[in-house]
Every structure is written in C-alpha cells, then in structure tokens.
C-alpha cells in the first residue's frame, strides 16, 4: 500500500477529522511504531503500527456508514464516563468492522432524538458537515400551542443569537397523518395536544432550534431530526440502526438534499382536504368544552390570525 500523510490515515480510520487529527499529532497523542509522530509524517497504513492514546487505530480497509434513530436520553458522544448510554451502545456488533472506531457525524442534544449518522470515514463526514456543501437538516418539533402571526414574523426576520442571526430555511405545520406516522416511530409516547411543525436548517449551531423557539416564547417540548440531506427517517424506529445505502452515501458526500424554492418561511395550510383527512384520535388542547362538541377545528396554518399571502409551494 502506498504511503500517505498520517492525518489522512487517521481520518480514514475514523479517529477524527484531518484537522483534528493534526491537533492530536501536535499534542503528542499519536505514535507510529512506538515513536512520537510528527506533523506531515507519511506512513504505510498496511505496515505501520499507529496508536492514539496508546490504543491501535481501526482497520481503514472498510468504511462503514450507519444511520441511527437516536432516542432521547442517549448521549451522542462515543465515550462519556458520566453517561448511562451512548450511541455506540445501540449499534449491533455485526454492523461494526473489526476494531473500527465509529463516531457521529455532528451531534444531537441528549434531550433530542432522531437521525444520527455514524461512520469511520473522516473525509466524507467533513463534507457532510461543511457549510459549503449546504446539507440540510430537517426537524419535527412539538410546542404546546400553535404559533401566532407575530411569532412567525419574528422567525422570518431571524433571531439574534451569540453566533449571529439564526434563520430557518423552511417552516410549516405538519398534517395529522404526518404526525401519526412519526409518533409510531417514537419512544416514549408523545403527550396529547401538542402542535407539530417541520423546520429546516443549514446552520448547525448548538441547540439552535431550542434557542430560536425559546426566544419567541414557544419552547420546544419534543425535537426529532427527520432528515439529513436526502436521507429520511421513513420507518426507522427509535433505537434502531440500518446501514446507509450507496446512493445515500453519494448524495450526502456530494452535498445533496437541498430543497427547491426560496428561503422564506412558508405559510402552509393542511395538505389534505377536510373530507379525506383522517381525524385526530386525541382532542385538541384548545377545544371549547363549554358547549356540546365545541367549535370545529380550523384548518392548520402557521398564520392563523391575519389574512395570508398566496401560498408558496415547497420543493420537498
């Protein structure tokens, strides 16, 4: 096997990204054949004995790409002595190559759930995470009451955070059928009476959606990542893992999954006609019980309080 730069070998083995691998080398945490490694060193990965913190690196001959539906309460880091369960505890050993070090591509907060990719391909994961490739993340989020017109306008303008102005690519109310299908995949069960929305991001700031919705006084009760680029949650239940398909790997590594349309937050009404939509099993939190039956539930919309502009059709 041809010689390669050490940081590239470490990234391919899933130790860290190339830049982070350089930092490990500079810190003296990497040894090659028993000697401290140096920045820019070239090695033959088939012959050299490479160790990080005294442990041999994984076998880079096989790259692995796994999709996990992370449950709430599970830590996204692969090693945390304070955590009861990490994401690696959920991965069947049959899906992991011998000695491979898998690590998550990005993170999900411990309280959040949904899609998380695990891989040992450092170069590929850098492409997925780099803002230049514009890989979207789509989330389903639940709040206690529907968003008001003023709250939607505030989200459209963008919310000032420490990192800058946080913006959403798209926002729309979820249909009853979408909510029911999602709830079938989640554990623990979802409390009744929540209002569900879908939000799409390209920024990746820490706890961004929770901070943004908290700033408009709409704290998030449940947050589920349902899409990363072209990869969707579909029927993957909480705690389950599956390998990524080859087209999904190529689509993510090439910056796939961008939506058509502009960047304006959408004003989307119920997709299905009232006559064909399946009724919700649980009651609405705003149902008026002072008279029999209460008022009929209005069509779901992000802008319920004022006349809405012409509808913008989302490419997704």
Regions found by a protein language model. Give the residues of each.
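Basic, flexible Lys/Arg- and Gly-enriched helix-loop patches that mediate nucleic-acid binding at interfaces
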Residues: 1-316
